Amino acid sequence: MLHTIKPVTNARKSTKRLGRGPGSGTGKTSGKGHKGQLARSGKTLRPGFEGGQIPFFQRIPKRGFHNFSQKRYALLNLKTLESFPQDTVVTPQLLLEKKIIKDQLCGIKVLSQGTLTKKLLVKASKFSKQAQAAILAVGGNIEVI
């Protein structure tokens, strides 16, 4: 029984043998054509290289500004907080454990999307005014860390 097992047709593709005579189809120049930069050894070119002319990404105009000192916050909405049981202390560590946020970045900011009906203690870096009001309105507490 075991001696009859074979791989599915075309499951194991044989490697292309280069430079093995004219009958092989890839003899002589081994599929590299004649001369030129790409026919030489070590032919790798960086992505976006256009043969020496000014590349497209340098030709188009640049716009805007990238603030390198910008702080990025992991965002958390009230509708996500609603999934926690009553009287839970919601901390960044708890959010990471439950995989609600992937990374703390510079901290966590709580936003007001959705509704909150449970009393919670929420520890975060920032709160929007509406989120803060919603948490306090249901008897919860906030703590800026």
Curated annotation (Swiss-Prot):
Q: Which Gene3D superfamilies does the UniProt record give?
A: 3.100.10.10
- Does this UniProt record's set of keywords contain rRNA-binding? yes
Q: Name one GO cellular component term.
A: cytosolic large ribosomal subunit
InterPro entries in UniProt:
Ribosomal_uL15 (IPR030878), Ribosomal_uL15/eL18 (IPR021131), Ribosomal_uL15/eL18_sf (IPR036227), Ribosomal_uL15_bac-type (IPR005749), Ribosomal_uL15_CS (IPR001196)
Q: Name one GO biological process term.
A: translation
Q: Which PROSITE patterns match?
A: RIBOSOMAL_L15
Family matches, as Pfam families? Ribosomal_L27A
Listed transmembrane segments: none
Which keywords does UniProt give here?
A: Ribonucleoprotein, Ribosomal protein, RNA-binding, rRNA-binding
One annotated GO molecular function is: rRNA binding
Q: Does the keyword rRNA-binding apply?
A: yes
Which parts of this chain are annotated as the region Disordered? 1-50
Q: Which stretches are tagged as biased composition: Gly residues? A: 20-30
Which family does the record assign?
Belongs to the universal ribosomal protein uL15 family.
Could you tell me what this protein does? Binds to the 23S rRNA.
Alphabetized PANTHER family for the sequence? 50S RIBOSOMAL PROTEIN L15 (PTHR12934), LARGE RIBOSOMAL SUBUNIT PROTEIN UL15M (PTHR12934:SF11)
Subunit and partners: Part of the 50S ribosomal subunit.
This chain belongs to the protein called: Large ribosomal subunit protein uL15
At the highest ranks, the source species' classification is: Bacteria, Bacillati, Mycoplasmatota, Mollicutes, Acholeplasmatales
